[in-house]
């Protein structure tokens, strides 16, 4: 008991913040003053014990002097009185029962304009548009650091909920950043491309539906080091799994990795610039003949690596190839068959041409305002591995350039609006990338039909990805997992409940009982039947908002869209012809004929 009291006294006078300590103890100076002058008053009496003096002093308060005494006894008694009062107040507060009036079962509520105001930029254009009334500033370093939030957004909405109309298009109309937009069916570039071009944006298009309406993309053009080779191989493996193949990295997959790494390493180091592409990789695989009955047989690729080993025994590609060659003839043949099956899409001549050279210049998106539209099919995922490779390289290239060239931050923010994110495929290490891109002025908007889509692709890492999105926008849907998690994160509010009772007998009696109970701010069934014009927006550290979806017709740039005027339709073929002529003019060398 004594130890507990001593501990309380020690905690009572524990000083952590001097300014706060002084502020909290100023009121107790009044008790010090009362104790000091009363001590001086009763000390003036002689005779009798202390109790008699105290009673006598109380009876003659009108004669008490109000001038503080500097006598040591009076000072000590004043301090003692103040300390006693403080200890009583502290003990009462520590042992007091905690009542939260009106919040007994939960304190959830909908956010108001006052809640979101600190997170919005005064200049409308410098915001991410989320709802009709809620926005998020693009400034990653606000004056008050506690209002800093990353710009990663998780957008969830079932088919027809307006993910493109209510989120993608409004944010493209802001035109404050460079954009990389996944464009299912290729309609967004047609409707928004002219607006962006007229406002100084350079348009880039990667089209995996119609290769003839696409700019060329060559992953080999972005290999800077051996680690980039490993990343490229990993992305190919992760997104080109055949039907029925084991999910784990079994022997065959590891062997394929070795072979791809060896060949790509050779191409990157030794091949001329015009041959650094997938066509060369396919040609090398086709030339890798293996004879089961003749282990000494050397195919053309064996001879290439033999010559390279003589020139440079410790070459990166040679090391990988020697590991691959440890396989016996029959095993090596099986590996080659697996490689051929995995890269079968490259047998299409148009795809080879698409990836023969590079026109996208991915590493320049953070240098100047650029809009890259990635057109993918929403029904066929055959060529989605190309998109996955592109995004993997894009994130790594921009992060490296921010660190190596710009001191950690790109001059132009790059926003990746990843519509139909589940159809892109697996981006290796995306859970780590999304956690680190913020500081480089890069952000990702992950747009899904249901949250379960993310878990299907990224498994245990899905929660990490969601956790790195400070903003969540729900546009509507009925997938159970999404509804359950959303309802739980909204929390519970405390409501009043009353019960009525009726007793039937000779004399009727009625009863009315009032009590409080907890209720979800919005239950799963209420979310399911939510008005089609409403959406739910959640920002980390702020109450959720039930608001109207953004009305794009009210945006000042709406008149620049094809939605407003069919004359604003973006002509992809015409644009690419103009870009082709401009490129030809830049690269043409004129020589004088004597």
Regions found by a protein language model. Give the residues of each.
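Basic- and hydrophobic-enriched, low-structure N-terminal and domain-boundary segments
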Residues: 1-161, 165-168, 592-594
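P-loop NTPase motor domains
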Residues: 2-4, 18-21, 25, 29, ...
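Short alpha-helical interface patches
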Residues: 59-65, 73-128, 226-236, 284-287, ...
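General secondary-structure edge motif
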Residues: 108-110, 135, 151-152, 319, ...
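Conserved long hydrophobic alpha-helices within structured protein cores
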Residues: 123-130, 385-393, 486
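Low-complexity, polar-biased intrinsically disordered regions enriched in Pro/Ser/Thr/Gly
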Residues: 136-142, 241-251, 273, 496-516
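Conserved ATP-driven motor cores of ASCE-family P-loop NTPases powering translocation/secretion/packaging/pilus
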Residues: 434-536
């Amino acid at each position: 008991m004594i130890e507990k009291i001593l501990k309380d006294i020690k905690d009572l006078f524990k000083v952590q913040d001097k300014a706060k300590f002084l502020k909290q103890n100023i009121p107790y100076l009044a008790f010090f003053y009362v104790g000091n002058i009363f001590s001086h008053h009763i000390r003036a009496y002689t005779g009798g014990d202390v109790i008699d003096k105290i009673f006598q002093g109380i009876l003659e308060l009108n004669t008490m002097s109000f001038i503080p005494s500097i006598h040591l006894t009076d000072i000590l008694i004043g301090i003692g009185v103040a300390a006693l009062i403080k200890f009583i107040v502290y003990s009462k507060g520590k042992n007091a029962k905690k009542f939260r009036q009106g919040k007994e079962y939960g304190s959830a509520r909908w956010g108001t304009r006052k809640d979101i105001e600190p997170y919005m930029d005064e200049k409308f254009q410098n915001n991410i548009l989320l709802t009709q009334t809620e926005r998020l500033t693009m400034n990653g370093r606000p004056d008050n650091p506690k209002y800093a939030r990353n710009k990663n957004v998780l957008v969830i909405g079932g088919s027809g909920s307006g993910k493109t109309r209510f989120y993608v298009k409004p944010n493209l109309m802001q035109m404050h950043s460079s954009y990389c937009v996944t464009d299912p069916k290729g309609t967004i570039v047609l409707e928004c491309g002219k607006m962006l071009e007229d406002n100084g944006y350079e348009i880039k298009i990667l089209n995996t539906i119609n290769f003839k309406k696409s700019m060329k993309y060559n992953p080999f053009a972005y290999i800077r080091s051996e680690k980039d080779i490993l990343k490229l191989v990993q992305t190919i493996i992760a997104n080109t799994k055949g039907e029925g193949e084991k999910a784990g990295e079994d022997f065959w997959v590891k062997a394929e990795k070795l072979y791809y790494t060896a060949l790509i390493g050779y191409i990157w180091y030794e091949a001329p610039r015009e041959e650094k592409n997938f066509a060369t990789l396919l040609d090398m695989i086709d030339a890798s003949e293996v004879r089961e009955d003749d282990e000494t047989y050397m195919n053309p690729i064996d001879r290439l690596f033999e010559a390279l080993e003589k020139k440079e025994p410790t070459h990166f590609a040679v090391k990988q190839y020697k590991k691959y060659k440890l396989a016996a003839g029959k095993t090596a043949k099986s590996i080659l068959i697996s490689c051929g099956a995995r890269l079968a899409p490259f047998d299409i001549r148009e795809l080879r041409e698409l990836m023969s050279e590079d026109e996208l210049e991915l590493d320049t998106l953070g240098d100047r305002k650029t809009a890259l539209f990635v057109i993918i099919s929403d029904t066929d995922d055959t060529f989605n591995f190309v998109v996955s490779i592109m995004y993997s390289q894009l994130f790594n290239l921009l992060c490296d350039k921010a660190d190596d060239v710009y001191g950690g931050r790109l001059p132009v923010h790059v926003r990746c609006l990843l519509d139909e994110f589940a159809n892109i495929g697996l981006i290796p290490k995306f859970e780590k990338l999304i956690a680190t891109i913020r500081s480089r002025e890069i952000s990702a908007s992950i747009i899904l039909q249901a949250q379960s889509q993310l878990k299907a692709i990224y498994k245990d890492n899905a929660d990490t990805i969601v956790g790195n999105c400070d903003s969540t926008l729900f546009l509507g849907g009925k997938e159970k997992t999404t509804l359950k998690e959303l309802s739980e994160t909204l929390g519970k509010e405390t409501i009043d409940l009353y019960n009525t009772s009726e007793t039937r007998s000779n004399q009727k009696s009625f009863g009315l009982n009032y009590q409080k109970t907890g209720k979800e701010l919005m239950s799963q069934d209420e979310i399911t039947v939510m008005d089609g014009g409403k959406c739910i927006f959640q920002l980390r550290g702020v109450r959720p908002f039930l608001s109207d979806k953004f009305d794009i017709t009210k945006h000042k740039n709406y008149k620049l869209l094809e939605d407003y005027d069919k004359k604003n339709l973006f002509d992809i073929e015409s644009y690419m012809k103009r870009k082709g002529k401009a490129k030809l003019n830049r690269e043409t060398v004129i020589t004088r004929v004597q």
